[in-house]
Every structure is written in structure tokens, then in C-alpha cells.
Amino acid sequence: MQQTTDILGAALAHHQAGRLGDAKAGYEQLLAREPAHPDALHFLGLLTCQAGQPDEGIALMRRSIDAYPSAIYHNNLGNALRERGRLDDAIAQYREAVRRQPDYAEAHNNLGDALREARQPDASMQHCAQAIALRPDYAQAYNNLGNALKDLGQTDAAVLAYGKAIEHDPRYADAYNNLGNVLTTQRKFDAAVDSYRAAVALAPQNPITHRNLGAALLARGDRDEAIATLHRLVELAPADAQARVDLGTALRDAGQADAAIAQFERAAQLSPLRADAHAGLAEVLYRRRQTARAAECMTRALELAPDHGPAYRMLGDMYHDLGKYDASVMCYRAATELDANDIDAHHRCAMVLLKQNRADDALHHARAALALNDRAAPAHMTLGDVLGMLGDVDGELAHYRRAVELDVTNPVLHDRLIFALATHPSIDQQETRRAARHFGEYVEADARPFAHIDTSVRASNRRLRIGWVSGDLVTHPVGIFLEGVLAHLDRHRLELIAYPTSAAEDDTTARLKPHFDAWHPLLELPDEQAAQRIRGDGIDVLVDLSGHTAQNRLGVFAWKPAPVQVTWIGFFASTGLRAIDYVLGDRHVLPPGEEAHFVERPWRLPDSYLCFTPPHAALDVGPLPLRENGAMTFGYFGKLGKMNDAVVRVWSRVLAAVPGARLFLKAGELDGERALRRTAERFARNGIDASRLVMEGRSPRTDYLTAYRRVDMMLSPFPYPGGTTTAESLWMGVPVLGMKGERFVTHICESVLQTAGLADWIARDEDDYVAKAVAAAADPERLDALRHALRARLLASPLCDAPRFAKHLEDAFYGMWMDRTNAGADERVAAGDERN
């Protein structure tokens, strides 16, 4: 009969050789003879675990321990339990192993590793150290000691431990990988890359080391090599969604959008429940301006991971770009609820609420953003925007000043400050000029102006190429005033090239485009490239139609891409740029004595600097409301921010002096309940009951114009009146009462009224303003007659004489051309002679 030891020896030999079937037969043969044979039970248990039956294998191993409780059996059972995910039970077996055999180095090492997994790094470190004490060349124990030290934050000691592991086993790939991890934690990316490369060389089929190497290469800026490494990772693990997310992220950041999209899409297919795959795809689609699909993907990501604040913030950005402002606000608020310290979400939420004219709601988020970082210039800017809409012009100005102090490099901050200074009721215009010049000095310092050829060779009668730079070639005051003029410019004298700075287009854009010989958007071009484009187009006169308003490109003008540069119509104060030669106005907005407000030289058109294009809607003037209502209706259609405290006080005096009179206010801000309440409270503080106010929000353009039929007389605010609204009011037969001013912006209403022959509707001061309003209200016959005559009067005035205006504008361009090119003072046109 075969001896027991022979059967066991043969079975073990088969087991070690991988012949598991033969080994199993041998163990079972032995157990048939000796059912409680501890080695047979134990090794059959190990084999059964290897064969994918862990529960049956663990049961056999427990029987072996019952038969013979050796330290080795406890250690091996611990390994089996750990592989099964039963960490606490495994730790108990390792502890029993070292209790039974205190000098059992392998059991101490395994216990240390398991304790680290159980987040007990101190205990882990002790047992790993004990294993090393028992076996000083134990590389695996050094590696596990390094892991414990890393978890304890002792990174320098961890580096030493991994180094010892590698010293004792130079082919220990895991130790190199772990060393790379701790070096990455220390931001020693060069050394980390070296360690990961060693790990990859030793274990070239291990995806983990490729992933870590790719991340370290990205961290130190080796993008191309990182992408190549991550491609190798995907080759090794094509079904690993995380690998594809990592590669997609690297490709996205490298600007390889199509390749990135392919990786994120494949990751989402492999693992549909991976939020980061959907979020990564959303982000790259958003960068490709596929915003609608990007929003769908980000929504899916948030369904899978609803606690991810940054994803809500980005989805808010997407909804904003899609014009879905309510949804955008909801997303930003969700982001701030998840993380009250998300300054970007607070800031962006405030900006969208402002676009919805919800200044009161915006105030909370603007203040929250600033509280999180009072040195964040954009947060100061946004709070300034909110306060301005709420009518707090001093608070608005203070925050704009602070924003510029914090970030002098941001031109938008300068724009806000200069605009606020120009329209503030009590700011000296020399301060506005200084702020504008501060901006000019900054942008001109970064520009290298183009040199232009000797002007003596330029002919005075050649066809001029005129460039028009604007973000407002839409239904906007600029577009409205420009439309009629372009149609009447002499195309034999002028060639027109548009340089839009905004992607926005509408019906007005469609009517404007045919008047241009070329349409060259500047949206994606930095200032220098935009200037080179204009220079390459051979522009003779470059016209700025924005000044310090939204989407301006004053930085382009600093490069002096055209020999003659002029600012017109879009703004009402100095740009601050010496590179802009002229500011175009008229004798009303640029009266003698106010030239010092500008860095640019004033150039005055003979009649008006504005040319009004009547609305295309076929609307009648309508009867005088006073006749039908029996009470006077004053009106103001414009931004509430123009209604400063002095304006509210004066208008309240008018209402108090005209019994039964009402004030019809129409503004986008009045779509909000809080704005309605706040406006009523402002008048109540001046003794005017809310019943005397009619307040309406935004309307479609035709409905907006129709609303003028409900007004007897418009009241223009001061010092920031309306230009477009004044002209529109006159066209609808409604006279406008204006206030004489002392700077360009305050003269705009004056210019319209003077040109329309309504100089007697300009008040000298507040008392005269009230007196004129009261007198007009007391003379319905005059109002009625004026109402039915105003449209014809306006249309017959130079304000609506587009051919006349176009000729003056052409002459101005030629006059500027001759003036700046020194072609001879005797060739200057008469219009230019009016400047001082």
C-alpha cells in the first residue's frame, strides 16, 4: 500500500506544477484514508480557492486548523479570507498566526498590510517593522512599511522605505510604482517619472504603472509623452473605462477634441454608470460649442453623481449660453448648496440674475462671492454691477475702483469704472479722463503701433477704406442709428468693411450686412492678430463704435492698425487712447470749453452726431392720453439705474405739482417683484403714493413702441439721459423734457432735442425742469398739437435726413484723413474746421 507521505508528496508536486486536477485527486485519496489529515485538508482548501470556489476552500482550511492549529495555516487562511473581501476575519487569522509564532515574519508582514487596508497605519507600521527586524532583507515588508508611512504623512520616511525595498529586490516593480506615488505626492515629478518608468520596464503589461506614469508626465508638462503612455494603457486595458477617461482628459487638454470625444464616448459605452465619462464628454463638447449636447451629457453625469458641485457649475454655464437663464440659476444655486465656498458659482449666479434684471436676488450671491475672497477683482466688479442696477451709484463706483486696483490688467474692469465715472451725478470729468488715460497707458504699453507710409503720397480724392469695429451691429442704439447712414454713403468715395466683435445677429444685422463690402469678425482673434488683420485689409479710417461699452476692442486700436482712428456713437467719454485720433460729435455734445474732457481731438459734424433710423413697425401716433384719461401721464422708458436720487426727487416734485398725474415707468428690471416694490418705496419716501405709478417690465419691440401711445410727455433722467429713447419718443409723437448738462453724456438728449427744433424743452436746472413739466401739463392744447406734428417735424429735421448726414460723415472721414496725413490744411473740409 502507498504510504501517506508519498501520496501527499505526489499531490503537492502536481499542485506546484499547476496540475490541479491530479493534485485534487491526490488530496482526496489521502482524505479518504485519513479524513482529518491536516495537510491534505489545508492544501485541498488552497486548491479549491484557486479553482474559484473560495467559500468551500475556506471551509476546508478551517477544518485543517481544527485538526492542527499551526501558525502557517492561520496565515494562509488569512490570505484566503482577505481575497474574499473579509478583511476583519483575515486580520484575526494573521493575529492568531503571530500569537502562535511571534517570529513569523511573513505573518507580521501580511498583518501589517491588512491593517493598512483597514486604515490603521500606526499598527500596520509596527508589524511591518517587526517583519523587517525578523528578516532584514525582506523587500515586501519594506514596501508595506513605506505604504503605512505614506498614509501617516511621513513621506520622506516612506521614500527611504521604498528605497530599501528596491535595494533588496531591484526587480520589485510594485516598490518602484509606490515610490513614484509618494514622489508625486511631494510634487517631485521628475523623480516620480523615473520611478514609474522603472516599474513599466519591469512590468510592461501592468496597466496601473502606465496610468501613473501618464499622470506624472502630465503633471510635469510632458503632454505628448503622457498621451502616448495613456494610449499604451488603453491598448493594455481596452475595456478599462477609467483608462479611456484618463486618455480623453489628456487629449481634451491638448486640444485634440475629436480624439477626446471618441475616448469619452467609448468610456461611457463600457461603463454607462461612470459619471466622469459623461462629464468629460460634456466638457469637450462644450469647448467645441456643441452646447445643447454638452448639456445633455452633463445632466446625465449629475444624475449619476448628484453631489458634484463643479458639474452643476459647468451645466449652469451651458444653460447660460443656451439662453436658459432660469435653469442656469438653478444649477449655480445647486453648486453653492453643495459647496457654500464655491466663489465661481456665486459669482456667475449673480451675473445671470443681473441679466434677468433680478438685482435683489443677485445681491446675495455677489456679496457671498466677495466674502469668500475680497481680493477677487471680478467679484468686486459684479457687486458693483448689482449696486448700480439698484441705484447705489456710490457703492457701484467704490467697487469698480477696488476692482481696478486689484487687477489693472483686466480691460473690462477699466470699462466699468470709466463708464460709472462718466455717468456719475457728481464726478468731475477730469477724474473720468484720468481713469481713461490710466487705461490707455496700460493697453498702449503692451502694443507696438504699426508704422504708416509717408502720407505725402496719399491723394485727397482717393476712395477710402473705412473699417467699423463694433459688438452692437444688432437691434441696439448703435445699429439703429447706423442703419440709415450706411445706405446713403457714397460707395464711390468709401469702401466699408465691418469688424463685428460679437457673434450675435438679428433682423437689424441682416439689414446692415448688405451695406458692407466685407464682414470680418474679430471674435476669436487676440488684439495683435486682429490689428494685423485690419492692417492687412489696408484700412484708412478705423471707427470704434463701442468705447468703454461691452464687447469693445480698444486693445486693437492701441496697435494703430489704421493711420486714422476715430471713436463715434457707442460711448460718451474719452477712450483714453492716444492711438485714437478723434472723437466724433456735434456742437451740442462737444461744446467749446469741454475739449479737455478728452484725450482724442474733437471733430464736430455740422448738425447732429446722430442719425435716427425710424422704426420699421407701421405704428400710428395715437391720440393724446390726457384727452381720454382726464389726467396727465408722464413717462420714462429706460434703465432704473439712471433714476438716481436727484431724479426721483425732481420727478416726485413734478407729480406733486400736477394733481392726478401719473408716472409710467417701463424698464426690464420691473419684471421682478422686488424692483417694483423698491421703486415704489423710493417715490414713497418723496411723498408719492404707489397708486400714481404705472410700472411695466420688458416687452417685444413693437409692443414697446406702442406703449408710447399711453404717455403724454416723457421725462428724461439726468445726468445720464437717453438718446435712442428720446428719438423714439419724438417719433411716436411724445415730447421729451431734458436737462442741460455739462459733459458729453449729459448733452445727448440736448443734441436730439436741439436738432429736432425743440430747444425750449431743455431745462436750465431742477427748478426750471419742474416748471416746464407743470406748464406743459397745464396746456393740453399745446401737447395735442405737438403730438400730431412731432413725427413730421422729426422726419424733416437733420436727425432723420440720412443722405445729408451721410454726406457730412463722408466729409468728416476725408477731413480727418487729410488732417492726419498732412496733405494740406487748405484741403480740409468745412465740417472739420469746426473743431477746436
Language-model features: locations:
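Conserved hydrophobic helix-helix packing surfaces used for dimerization/oligomerization
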Residues: 466-468, 634, 663
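Donor-sugar nucleotide-binding helix/loop cap in glycosyltransferases
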Residues: 715, 729
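Short alpha-helix at the nucleotide-sugar/activated-sugar donor binding site of glycosyltransferases
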Residues: 730-731, 754
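Short hydrophobic "strand-cap" motifs at the C-terminus of beta-strands
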Residues: 469, 637-638, 666, 696
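Alpha-helical solenoid repeat scaffolds of the TPR/TPR-like class and their adjacent stem/linker regions
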Residues: 1-630, 649, 681-688, 699-713, ...
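A conserved nucleotide-sugar
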Residues: 493-495, 652-681
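A short structural motif in glycosyltransferase catalytic domains
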Residues: 717-719
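Short acidic/histidine- and often glycine-rich active-site loop of Leloir-type glycosyltransferases
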Residues: 746-757, 762
